[in-house]
């Protein structure tokens, strides 16, 4: 697997995380077999449903752990990662462009060790 997207989840419901998962599924010009998502629950009693987790064309791994805070939960996601590259997203993020991952894959194929990208606020301001 080329890229795994790591997402900590605390009290976010299916409705909160669905736009991010949808925006990953909408990415164009990439092989969905090269993408995986790892979501780690940070000890919350709000769990994502199997219906949501099984409705995407890429692999989603979901892990439940004790409440330790967002940094420890990101590290827990990292412990499960096996891809060549990793990306961190928050549960309420989403990809603005359907070509965002294609652009990242293009740069990965050049051989960069790390990449940084801009983000856009909810108001769509960079």
Where do the protein language model's features map onto the residues?
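Conserved donor NDP-sugar-binding/catalytic core segment of glycosyltransferases
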Residues: 94, 98-126
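Cell-envelope/extracellular polymer assembly enzymes that use nucleotide-activated donors
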Residues: 2-4, 36
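Short aromatic/hydrophobic "clamp" motif used to bind/position activated sugar donors
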Residues: 86
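A conserved acidic beta->alpha catalytic loop
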Residues: 39-50, 90
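Short beta-strand/loop segment that forms part of the nucleotide-sugar
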Residues: 33-44, 61-66
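Short, acidic/glycine-rich phosphate-metal binding loop used to engage nucleotide
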Residues: 11, 63-70, 94
């Amino acid at each position: 697997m080329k890229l795994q997207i790591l997402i900590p989840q605390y009290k976010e419901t299916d409705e909160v995380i669905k736009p991010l998962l949808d925006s990953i599924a909408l990415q164009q010009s990439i092989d969905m077999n090269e993408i995986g998502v790892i979501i780690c629950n940070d000890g919350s009693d709000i769990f994502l449903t199997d219906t949501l987790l099984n409705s995407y064309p890429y692999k989603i791994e979901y892990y439940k752990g004790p409440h330790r805070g967002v940094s420890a939960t990101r590290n827990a996601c990292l412990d499960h990662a096996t891809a060549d590259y990793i990306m961190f997203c928050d549960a309420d993020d989403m990809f603005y462009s359907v070509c965002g991952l294609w652009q990242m894959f293009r740069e990965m194929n050049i051989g960069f060790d790390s990449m940084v990208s801009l983000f856009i606020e909810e108001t769509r301001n960079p």
